[in-house]
Amino acid sequence: VILGQGMPAYGALQRNIYNNEDVEHYDYDPEKAKAVLEEAGCELGDDGFYYRDGEKVGFVISVGAGDQVRVDIAQIAAQQLQQIGMDVTIEIPAQVDWGGQMAYLIGWGSPFDADDHTYKVFGTDKGANYSGYSNELVDQYLTEARQSDDPEVRKEAYDKFQVELANDPAYAFICYIDANYVADADIQGIDPDTIMGHHGVGIFWNVADWTIQ
């Protein structure tokens, strides 16, 4: 789907200076997924799908219509889950019902401070916490990180946050997508360190400082 322009994801701060690589990555492992289902009491039926208490195991992935890459990612995710025995399909609703959907494929990113894309996303009742995720330890660690300007204090808090998030995931992280831009060599001042994906401020964050030689 992304033609090699990206990397598998395992956490919220993977491309940030505060990334903690020593957490569970949840790498793609179909056999482990089957084992988890069976440990949870699911049994494989004659139709190739798992059942639990007489009900077929599955869910619907909702995805926005305006981003074909996300639609394609959702389709592949559904196909891979079907291959291990889960009845997973996708839908492309005209309007997003944050409270009524079963799962939603979403994306976000920020080249700025770690607080910018953690506190508001994973903090209880925060504005970008669309899934209603709530974890007291996550709240505590994110608050500690944003209340300090000491890099060591913040690193310790973000390390703990990432460990807890891996133990109690809010999302299934799929991938980080690279952004590719082409600009005339005469344009000076483009900052590659703040280039991000297809939405947000992105490459134009400092356009007022650009010059043409």
Question: Residue spans of the language-model regions?
Answer:
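Sec-exported extracytoplasmic/periplasmic mature domains
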Residues: I2-M7, Q14, Y18, E38-E43, ...
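Short strand-loop junctions, especially beta-strand C-caps/beta-turns
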Residues: S62-G66, P93, S148
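Solvent-exposed loop/turn segments at secondary-structure junctions
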Residues: G4-P8, I17-N19, A65-V69, Q95-V96, ...
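Non-membrane alpha-helical structural segments and their capping/turn regions in soluble enzymes
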Residues: V71, N135, D139, P151-K155
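Append "and occasionally in soluble cytosolic enzymes with long acidic Gly/Pro-rich linkers
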Residues: V1-I76, K160, T211-I212
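Active-site lining segments that contact anionic ligands and/or coordinate catalytic metals
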Residues: K56-G58, Q101, P169-Y171
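Short, solvent-exposed loop/beta-turn-alpha elements that line the ligand-binding surface or hinge
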Residues: Y18-A35, G45-V57, G99, Y119-Q147, ...
